[in-house]
Protein backbone atom coordinates (compact mmCIF):
# COMPACT_ATOMS: atom_id res chain seq x y z
CA UNK A 1 0.00 0.00 0.00
CA UNK A 2 1.25 3.51 -0.79
CA UNK A 3 0.18 7.06 -0.01
CA UNK A 4 1.41 10.53 -0.83
CA UNK A 5 1.71 11.95 2.69
CA UNK A 6 4.29 10.98 5.32
CA UNK A 7 2.91 9.38 8.50
CA UNK A 8 6.02 10.50 10.42
CA UNK A 9 6.66 14.22 10.87
CA UNK A 10 10.20 15.34 10.14
CA UNK A 11 10.41 17.03 13.53
CA UNK A 12 9.68 13.67 15.21
CA UNK A 13 12.25 11.88 13.03
CA UNK A 14 14.89 14.49 13.83
CA UNK A 15 14.05 14.36 17.56
CA UNK A 16 14.55 10.57 17.57
CA UNK A 17 17.88 11.10 15.84
CA UNK A 18 18.99 13.71 18.38
CA UNK A 19 17.97 11.36 21.21
CA UNK A 20 20.14 8.61 19.73
CA UNK A 21 17.12 6.39 19.04
CA UNK A 22 18.27 5.28 15.62
CA UNK A 23 19.63 2.18 13.98
CA UNK A 24 20.46 1.22 10.45
CA UNK A 25 20.08 -1.90 8.37
CA UNK A 26 23.26 -3.65 7.24
CA UNK A 27 22.31 -3.06 3.62
CA UNK A 28 21.88 0.65 4.39
CA UNK A 29 25.39 0.82 5.84
CA UNK A 30 26.76 -0.99 2.79
CA UNK A 31 24.86 1.33 0.44
CA UNK A 32 26.10 4.36 2.31
CA UNK A 33 29.69 3.10 2.25
CA UNK A 34 29.44 2.56 -1.52
CA UNK A 35 28.57 6.27 -1.77
CA UNK A 36 31.43 7.13 0.62
CA UNK A 37 29.10 8.02 3.48
CA UNK A 38 29.77 6.86 7.02
CA UNK A 39 26.92 6.54 9.54
CA UNK A 40 27.44 10.13 10.71
CA UNK A 41 27.11 11.25 7.10
CA UNK A 42 23.82 9.38 6.76
CA UNK A 43 22.54 11.04 9.93
CA UNK A 44 23.57 14.44 8.57
CA UNK A 45 21.55 13.77 5.41
CA UNK A 46 18.52 12.90 7.55
CA UNK A 47 18.93 16.05 9.64
CA UNK A 48 18.97 18.13 6.45
CA UNK A 49 15.74 16.64 5.05
CA UNK A 50 12.96 19.02 4.11
CA UNK A 51 9.36 18.29 3.11
CA UNK A 52 10.29 18.79 -0.56
CA UNK A 53 12.58 15.71 -0.31
CA UNK A 54 9.57 13.49 0.46
CA UNK A 55 8.73 10.97 -2.27
CA UNK A 56 6.10 8.55 -0.91
CA UNK A 57 5.00 6.39 2.02
CA UNK A 58 4.55 2.66 1.76
CA UNK A 59 4.00 -0.27 4.05
CA UNK A 60 6.65 -2.89 4.69
CA UNK A 61 6.44 -6.19 2.86
CA UNK A 62 6.39 -8.12 6.13
CA UNK A 63 3.74 -6.06 7.93
CA UNK A 64 1.22 -3.88 6.13
CA UNK A 65 0.55 -1.89 9.30
CA UNK A 66 4.12 -0.55 9.49
CA UNK A 67 4.72 2.50 7.32
CA UNK A 68 7.98 3.61 5.73
CA UNK A 69 8.57 7.18 4.58
CA UNK A 70 10.66 7.40 1.42
CA UNK A 71 12.76 10.49 0.78
CA UNK A 72 14.93 11.26 -2.23
CA UNK A 73 17.28 14.04 -1.11
CA UNK A 74 20.00 15.40 -3.33
CA UNK A 75 23.44 15.02 -1.73
CA UNK A 76 26.97 15.88 -2.83
CA UNK A 77 27.09 12.53 -4.66
CA UNK A 78 23.64 12.83 -6.24
CA UNK A 79 20.14 11.73 -5.34
CA UNK A 80 19.75 8.97 -2.75
CA UNK A 81 16.84 6.73 -1.77
CA UNK A 82 16.24 6.99 1.96
CA UNK A 83 13.59 4.94 3.80
CA UNK A 84 12.68 5.87 7.36
CA UNK A 85 10.59 3.66 9.63
CA UNK A 86 9.66 4.23 13.26
CA UNK A 87 9.15 1.08 15.35
CA UNK A 88 8.80 1.27 19.13
CA UNK A 89 10.04 4.89 19.09
CA UNK A 90 13.25 3.92 17.28
CA UNK A 91 14.08 5.30 13.85
CA UNK A 92 15.23 2.62 11.40
CA UNK A 93 17.14 3.85 8.38
CA UNK A 94 17.59 2.35 4.92
CA UNK A 95 19.91 4.24 2.54
CA UNK A 96 21.04 3.59 -1.03
CA UNK A 97 21.89 5.24 -4.31
CA UNK A 98 18.92 6.05 -6.49
Question: What residue spans do the PLM features occupy?
Answer:
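Ribonuclease/tRNase effector modules and their secretory precursors
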Residues: 1-98
Amino acid sequence: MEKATPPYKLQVIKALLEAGKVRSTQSALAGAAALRFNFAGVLAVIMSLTPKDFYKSMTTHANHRIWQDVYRPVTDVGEVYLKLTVVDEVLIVSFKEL
